[in-house]
Amino acid sequence: MAADTTKKQFIRIRGANVNNLKNLSVDIPRDQFVVLTGLSGSGKSSLAFDTIYAEGQRRYMESLSSYARQFLGQMEKPDVESIEGLPPAISIDQKSTNRNPRSTVGTVTEIYDYFRLLYARVGIPHCPKCGREIKKQTVDQMVDSIMSFPERTKIQLLAPVVRGRKGTHAKLLEQAKRSGYVRVQIDGNMYELSEEISLDKNIKHNIEIVVDRLIVKPGIEKRLSDSIETVLELAEGLLMVDTMDGNIHNFSQSFSCPDCEVSIDEIEPRSFSFNNPFGACPDCLGLGYKMEFDIDLMIPDKSLSILEGAIVVTGWQSCTSEGSFSRAILDALAREYDFSLATPFENYPEKIKDILINGTNGHSVKVYYKGQRGEGVYDVAFPGLIRNVEQRYRETGSDTMKQEYESFMRITPCKTCKGQRLKKESLAVTVADKNIYEITNLSIEKLKAFLADMQLSEQQLLIGKQILKEIRARVSFLSDVGLDYLSLGRATGTLSGGEAQRIRLATQIGSGLVGVAYILDEPSIGLHQRDNDRLLSSLMKLRDLGNSLIVVEHDEDTMRAADCIVDIGPGAGEHGGQLVAMGTAEDLMKNENSITGAYLSGKLKIPVPAERRKPTGFLTIKGAAENNLKNIDVKVPLGIMTCITGVSGSGKSSLINEILYKRLARDLNRARVIPGKHKDILGVDQLDKVINIDQSPIGRTPRSNPATYTGVFDQIRDLFAATADAKARGYKKGRFSFNVKGGRCEACSGDGIIKIEMHFLPDVYVPCEVCKGKRYNRETLEVKYKDKSIYDVLNMTVEEALTFFENVPSIKRKIQTLYDVGLSYIRLGQPSTELSGEAQRIKLATELSKRSTGKTIYILDEPTTGLHFADVHKLVEILKRLSEGGNTVVVIEHNLDVIKTADYIIDIGPEGGDKGGTVVACGTPEEVAQSPVSYTGKYVKKYLE
């Protein structure tokens, strides 16, 4: 019987019901580039990650022994009837970025491992003190080297027994004389050992014993070899050869510097690992930085006096009031050193500031204390604010207190290694005149050029050829996915989701696997339109190797390049989970049911505003120089919506998140943050609040949900507490909280589920038997509002709740904003852990529902992440609403539909990394479109037509 080949050509999914999928059946072509698209919340990720990937992983796990499975953590079987033709699956999503401070681009791509091997095998060690090259040679190599001197050269072999040490060294000289040696060289002068030698014991001396004198000629090899061995024994592996013409040749049996008496260990790959004690800087343990208390965070406003509360660090706030021990110490210091606690801190002389910050240097002061803890006189040697707080930080066992103290710390480069992470001996090893830190801190673009032009000796090339081939290939893959501006030393914790995903994509291309299903989640995030083609060609390369690519994506270019598009919908949440259309971009355009097709064909489009609003003022950032910013001045308009654009790595986040947001947060919100490098920001007085609407989760536990985050749950609980039934039972609003005892089910502590550990099977979460997953006890659930219990309300979607509460204006207003930002499908009580993609829009809705001051600045970083064309359409309307009434909206964005609707654009560039950091163009979208040097202008021009 012939095999059914159609099964092999497709991943055949039947009856998928994961999350909101409605018994979905679809045949996804194998070995092709397939894009899954649809509205946000339509079920794309449920199909790609929770069904296809989950089942692929589960089947692989099933093939392992139960012993191995207990360490790996099992995956639950997805709710699907069958999946046939499923290849092994690899997921490249955005959530699994490694936030470990020891993880870098180099370590996650394993390029750094190859560099460690290269440096260990062909690196040239140098003395970490004087910088001279250190060579390690065997006796035979030394003999060959000396025999290569011109014939008849007179040489003497010297044993350097003392290098730069004080003393008379009489014993050593006597010992040399007894051993039969005749001459000795001291501080460059030759002496006979038979004469009286008297050395000044207070001066550092160099002493070399003359072991042999020879003339270079054939036949002396045996004698030369014996003499060298004698020298090496006397001088602990060192040999000096004086050629009588004043030239000294140094030889070493180990890696040691004859001048500085510095020895270095055998060079191995681990010598270059900052995660290994053999290579890491001993001071910062390979982190490259230290967390240190910062006096600018401890005393942020130096125009205040101590009595007015200048010292804000934990443990010292009480020094403003009489009766605290901290106040008694400061009173004692003021008496001893004659200063007043009522003087503004900035007016103290440097000596007084130093005493307060760094202490009395062991000098005790008399502290008179009278307070709640009794009274007495104490002798206290004040260690200074910094050391005192350091001690408290070390001694506290409370995580909360540790976090509190850490808010007064800042990251400073390690003083020992200058932020280079390795010990000095490892940093003194070079390849092509660069140490490993210098090489890994080059941008990928520069590194690629450096590797191409690398000058190595014949022997180095012979040894390092294969290693260099691997390095060059992997560096090229990083370049191909548009990451030229990154360096291998960049910490992975500082990467955006899109960057981290593209790095993992480059690693997978490098692995060269075949027959795998790669499942990706919006790889184009954070990528400028200019770099999209490179990303697409990388994806094609992965497909052409013989792999299946399933990409969840909203980017138009990616859809048009795909072999097949699967459109899930038609709506979001309850209204999604079905197959709407499938085929090429052209097929979708012809399909009347596909909203995606309508946007691709241009039937639906986001309109360009008829007119651009004029700014009401400007914020002027002076001398911005954080990261790659080139000391630039930037004017940010107020009262309108501004888009900050530019290629990846151009400096957008440095300007907006590091400088503008942190400076405004410090000045307006009194946040304990240190802004990026800049001179000043003018015009801050025109604002009263800054809000950063980022993509971080709205909560880290399942107890946090949209209702609690937006604050609407408080009003819903008030409503339930106001019912006649609740009043009759004496229930207050706290009764309707699942976080406190009283109304919640105590069997599951209000979680609704109970976790059962299963060892080598996955942990099982079962609904609580007592409350049946409803989180509240029976009495609380008996209280109804319009025939619905508090559980029923939490289980409503935003759309259902909007109708249910239409006669309660305060509640309706908050729920309406969730609906307006496109979140009609989420449930009010849905755990925040299930809402990672929706977090930013929930925050947007929360801000929209607040009363506007007209002097607020909102900062958003790529709000279109995870949004379909139709969702972007809604977002544009929301951003316009936010900036009404005098508020300012600043958006970092690559999406051209958002950029074209902005009132103003500031384009940073022209390139990423070192070639970026300047303002390329600014003005309305129409003005920027005319700029001959702006990449953004070139692309936005097409969207304005």
Question: What does each of the following model-derived ranges do?
Answer:
Residues 1-945:
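Conserved phosphate-binding elements of NTP-dependent enzyme cores
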